[in-house]
Amino acid sequence: MNFENYEKEFFDRLGESCYMVLATSFEDHPMASMMTCLVFDGAIWMQTDKKFPKFGQIENNPKVALCKNATQIEGRASLCGHPLERQNEKFAMLMKKYHPESYEMYSKVDSEVVIKVIPEKAIDWLYEKGDDQIFNLDFINRKVNIQIYKNSKA
Protein backbone atom coordinates (compact mmCIF):
# COMPACT_ATOMS: atom_id res chain seq x y z
CA MET A 1 0.00 0.00 0.00
CA ASN A 2 1.35 3.46 -0.85
CA PHE A 3 1.71 6.41 1.54
CA GLU A 4 -1.45 8.11 0.27
CA ASN A 5 -3.55 5.09 1.29
CA TYR A 6 -2.01 5.01 4.79
CA GLU A 7 -2.52 8.76 5.07
CA LYS A 8 -6.20 8.44 4.12
CA GLU A 9 -6.72 5.60 6.63
CA PHE A 10 -4.94 7.66 9.30
CA PHE A 11 -7.23 10.67 8.84
CA ASP A 12 -10.29 8.41 8.57
CA ARG A 13 -9.42 6.84 11.95
CA LEU A 14 -9.15 10.28 13.54
CA GLY A 15 -12.63 11.09 12.26
CA GLU A 16 -13.99 14.41 11.06
CA SER A 17 -14.52 15.51 14.67
CA CYS A 18 -12.66 14.37 17.78
CA TYR A 19 -11.14 15.43 21.07
CA MET A 20 -7.35 15.55 21.31
CA VAL A 21 -4.74 16.78 23.74
CA LEU A 22 -2.69 19.65 22.29
CA ALA A 23 0.83 20.08 23.69
CA THR A 24 2.55 23.44 23.28
CA SER A 25 5.80 24.80 24.66
CA PHE A 26 7.79 28.00 24.86
CA GLU A 27 10.80 28.98 26.98
CA ASP A 28 10.86 25.67 28.88
CA HIS A 29 7.19 25.96 29.82
CA PRO A 30 5.17 23.06 28.37
CA MET A 31 1.42 22.76 28.63
CA ALA A 32 -1.24 20.34 27.51
CA SER A 33 -4.83 21.28 26.70
CA MET A 34 -7.83 19.15 25.78
CA MET A 35 -9.19 20.48 22.49
CA THR A 36 -12.25 20.02 20.32
CA CYS A 37 -10.77 19.21 16.91
CA LEU A 38 -11.98 19.02 13.35
CA VAL A 39 -10.09 17.02 10.73
CA PHE A 40 -10.26 18.07 7.09
CA ASP A 41 -8.05 19.04 4.16
CA GLY A 42 -5.07 17.09 5.53
CA ALA A 43 -4.94 19.11 8.75
CA ILE A 44 -6.28 19.19 12.30
CA TRP A 45 -8.19 22.34 13.21
CA MET A 46 -9.27 23.83 16.54
CA GLN A 47 -9.90 27.21 18.10
CA THR A 48 -8.78 29.05 21.21
CA ASP A 49 -8.87 32.49 22.76
CA LYS A 50 -5.95 34.85 22.15
CA LYS A 51 -5.92 35.47 25.92
CA PHE A 52 -4.91 31.88 26.71
CA PRO A 53 -1.24 30.90 27.18
CA LYS A 54 -1.33 28.33 24.35
CA PHE A 55 -1.97 31.14 21.85
CA GLY A 56 1.24 32.93 22.84
CA GLN A 57 3.16 29.69 22.89
CA ILE A 58 2.07 28.83 19.34
CA GLU A 59 2.82 32.37 18.20
CA ASN A 60 6.39 31.98 19.50
CA ASN A 61 6.90 28.26 18.81
CA PRO A 62 4.67 26.67 16.16
CA LYS A 63 5.97 23.14 16.86
CA VAL A 64 3.16 21.27 18.62
CA ALA A 65 2.08 17.73 19.42
CA LEU A 66 -1.37 16.16 19.53
CA CYS A 67 -2.53 12.93 21.12
CA LYS A 68 -5.72 10.92 20.65
CA ASN A 69 -5.87 7.49 22.27
CA ALA A 70 -2.81 5.60 20.97
CA THR A 71 -2.06 8.10 18.21
CA GLN A 72 0.67 10.71 18.64
CA ILE A 73 1.16 13.51 16.14
CA GLU A 74 3.92 16.08 15.76
CA GLY A 75 3.22 19.05 13.57
CA ARG A 76 3.41 22.73 12.85
CA ALA A 77 0.61 25.04 13.95
CA SER A 78 -0.49 28.21 12.24
CA LEU A 79 -2.91 30.87 13.46
CA CYS A 80 -5.62 31.35 10.84
CA GLY A 81 -7.71 34.29 11.99
CA HIS A 82 -11.15 34.51 13.56
CA PRO A 83 -13.48 31.48 13.21
CA LEU A 84 -16.10 33.50 11.32
CA GLU A 85 -13.73 35.04 8.77
CA ARG A 86 -14.31 33.98 5.17
CA GLN A 87 -11.18 31.79 4.96
CA ASN A 88 -12.51 29.73 7.90
CA GLU A 89 -15.95 29.09 6.41
CA LYS A 90 -15.50 25.29 6.32
CA PHE A 91 -14.21 25.29 9.91
CA ALA A 92 -17.24 27.29 11.11
CA MET A 93 -19.66 25.04 9.20
CA LEU A 94 -18.18 21.87 10.73
CA MET A 95 -18.05 23.39 14.24
CA LYS A 96 -21.72 24.28 13.94
CA LYS A 97 -22.51 20.74 12.70
CA TYR A 98 -20.53 18.74 15.29
CA HIS A 99 -20.29 21.12 18.25
CA PRO A 100 -23.22 23.56 18.07
CA GLU A 101 -22.92 24.56 21.74
CA SER A 102 -19.21 25.41 21.40
CA TYR A 103 -19.89 27.21 18.15
CA GLU A 104 -22.55 29.39 19.79
CA MET A 105 -20.52 30.05 22.95
CA TYR A 106 -17.08 30.70 21.49
CA SER A 107 -16.98 31.26 17.74
CA LYS A 108 -18.54 34.73 17.97
CA VAL A 109 -16.11 35.95 20.66
CA ASP A 110 -13.84 38.65 19.17
CA SER A 111 -10.64 37.21 20.65
CA GLU A 112 -11.12 33.67 19.27
CA VAL A 113 -8.65 32.35 16.70
CA VAL A 114 -8.51 29.21 14.54
CA ILE A 115 -5.45 26.97 14.84
CA LYS A 116 -4.47 24.71 11.94
CA VAL A 117 -1.99 21.90 12.57
CA ILE A 118 -0.26 20.31 9.60
CA PRO A 119 1.05 16.88 10.67
CA GLU A 120 4.76 16.24 10.07
CA LYS A 121 5.10 12.88 11.88
CA ALA A 122 2.69 10.46 13.50
CA ILE A 123 2.99 7.29 15.52
CA ASP A 124 -0.21 5.31 15.23
CA TRP A 125 -0.58 2.08 17.27
CA LEU A 126 -3.09 -0.41 15.92
CA TYR A 127 -3.98 -3.51 17.90
CA GLU A 128 -5.12 -6.37 15.68
CA LYS A 129 -5.05 -10.16 16.02
CA GLY A 130 -2.73 -10.12 19.02
CA ASP A 131 -0.12 -7.99 17.26
CA ASP A 132 0.61 -4.39 17.99
CA GLN A 133 1.27 -2.66 14.70
CA ILE A 134 3.09 0.64 15.00
CA PHE A 135 2.66 2.87 11.97
CA ASN A 136 5.33 5.59 11.78
CA LEU A 137 4.10 8.12 9.24
CA ASP A 138 6.47 10.75 7.86
CA PHE A 139 4.24 13.35 6.21
CA ILE A 140 7.18 15.47 5.02
CA ASN A 141 8.98 12.69 3.11
CA ARG A 142 5.71 10.84 2.36
CA LYS A 143 6.93 7.56 3.87
CA VAL A 144 5.52 4.98 6.25
CA ASN A 145 7.37 2.43 8.35
CA ILE A 146 5.38 -0.38 9.98
CA GLN A 147 6.71 -2.21 13.02
CA ILE A 148 5.20 -5.26 14.68
CA TYR A 149 5.60 -5.07 18.43
CA LYS A 150 5.28 -8.36 20.27
CA ASN A 151 5.47 -8.24 24.01
CA SER A 152 7.25 -11.36 25.18
CA LYS A 153 5.68 -12.92 28.25
CA ALA A 154 8.47 -13.56 30.73
Predicted regions and their residues:
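Hydrophobic alpha-helical segments typical of transmembrane helices
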Residues: 6-9, 54, 90
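Charged, low-complexity, helix/coiled-coil-prone segments
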Residues: 1-4, 29-41, 131-136
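A generic structural signal for nonpolar/aromatic side chains embedded in well-ordered alpha-helices
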Residues: 14, 58, 94-95
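Short secondary-structure boundary/capping segments
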Residues: 12, 36, 56, 105-107
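Short beta-strand segments
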Residues: 17-50, 55-58, 64-68, 76
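Charged, gly/pro-rich active-site loop segments
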Residues: 72-154
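Extreme N-terminal tail/first-helix region
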Residues: 1-20, 141-154
